[in-house]
Amino acid sequence: MSTPSSRSQAPETVTTGPIQGSEKIYQELPNGLRVPQRRVNLTNGEYLDLYDTSGPYTDTNAVIDLHKGLPPRAGIVTDRGTQLQRARAGEITAEMEFIAVREGVPAELVRTEVAAGRAVIPANHKHPESEPMIIGKAFGVKINANIGNSAVTSSIAEEVEKMVWAIRWGADNIMDLSTGKDIHQTREWILRNSPVPVGTVPIYQALEKTNGDPAALTWELYRDTVIEQAEQGVDYMTVHAGVLLRYVPLTAKRVTGIVSRGGSIMAAWCLAHHRESFLYTHFEELCEILARYDVTFSLGDGLRPGSIADANDEAQFAELRTLGELTKIAKSHGVQVMIEGPGHVPMHKIVENVKLEEELCEEAPFYTLGPLATDIAPAYDHITSAIGAAIIAQAGTAMLCYVTPKEHLGLPDRKDVKDGVIAYKIAAHSADLAKGHPRAQLRDNALSKARFEFRWEDQFNLSLDPDTAREFHDETLPAEPAKTAHFCSMCGPKFCSMRITADIREFAAENGLETQEDIDAMLARGMEEKSAEFAEHGNRVYLPIA
């Protein structure tokens, strides 16, 4: 895997070991596949099995060799067409069986959603290291984490560690957006060691080959770059084929113009040559290439709004209409398709985006960057965007592209990646709860029960981030006895509402108060006792001071 230019940057170690309070388990399938899960063992003898994206990196029995890469999964078929074509033919593939167990749904539901184009399974034949997953509104909301170097900073080793770190905390997919040196080598290291699907934006590498000159781009150069990446195993590719020459002037009066890197590159090419982009004119040829590998289209929103002021404008929706036309063409070639969405959108305009995407794009899975619900919080855009992400996911978006605290400010580091993933896991899980996903509330119920019963270790271990939950608790109550105390430092021992409620329940149990009738009877007896006491004192309201 190493080349002379990349050996010095090659990763030697990454984060491994189980997440606190958990162990890696597998559900064995008849076809030889093993579906991963994370089991949280509770102190009351119970356990909860969770959807797991961390790959073998949290398996204590796994041997990790970054130079060899991960072992390929069994049962990969490369000669029967794409997952879409096979689903339309009525076939439940090995990947669909795997996903059905992972999601806790019937395999036929997986097949029908893929056949209808409402879900995609990004699984390039050349990426056998990945564990099959699905993106579609009938399933759990997924999150994508962007990593990748820039011309200014980062190394191959750092990007591989970011990938492992992101999936440890719940990233379902990774996009390698490298724009600096060693793009091919960085992607190779990530792919060979990634148990989740990997996406790219091929135009970035193509532009690097022209030394950064958009006007020098050609269809042949781009086509060769796509084939190069598909051969490596890239599972889905962002293609900004909807940026048409006539749409570029629509952005002239925007506050922030064109903010998509890919969109701006293609807009510059269109203006330089004064014709439609080669991505649009050669789209059918591109479909044929992607179909050979079963690479999924992620049709890019090159004209997405980059500010609240530009949300839902003419340029954005004009491009979306074109993406709808391209979706039909891609499906006719048997290529799986998802649609990328904004961006920066105020809360009251968010749902309109989902409705219009589903109408124009035949309900292809929607994949959105946030959206940010306000522009005023640099350094906190993982929060501003998670607000919009939760709303748009509840409305039907299938996958959320995370935003880190460094958005608009710089290249995210390891801590930023974790903060972004956790913020988006909150948004995705909140949407799953609202949509009634069959497994979503089990975790909430388990944690709430642990909280009420003061099982602190279980509270930590059931949380999205056990390490930080424990750290925050121990800042003020670090002693080991505090892990069984019936209070925390917020309320102290006298004012804890849950302890008081527990005392009330104990009192009720001791006095046989199980129903409302029992309570009413107790109150009546109490009133009778007080009435008798009042009579004993002469029925006087005021008594002399003793």
Swiss-Prot record:
- Would you tell me the Gene Ontology cellular component terms? cytosol
Q: List where Polar residues composition bias occurs.
A: 1-19
Sequence positions that bind Zn(2+): H344, H408
Look up the EC number in the record and give it: 4.1.99.17
Which parts of this chain are annotated as the region Disordered? 1-20
Q: Return the Pfam families for the record.
A: ThiC-associated, ThiC_Rad_SAM
PANTHER family, sorted = PHOSPHOMETHYLPYRIMIDINE SYNTHASE, CHLOROPLASTIC, THIAMINE BIOSYNTHESIS PROTEIN THIC
What protein name applies here? Answer: Phosphomethylpyrimidine synthase
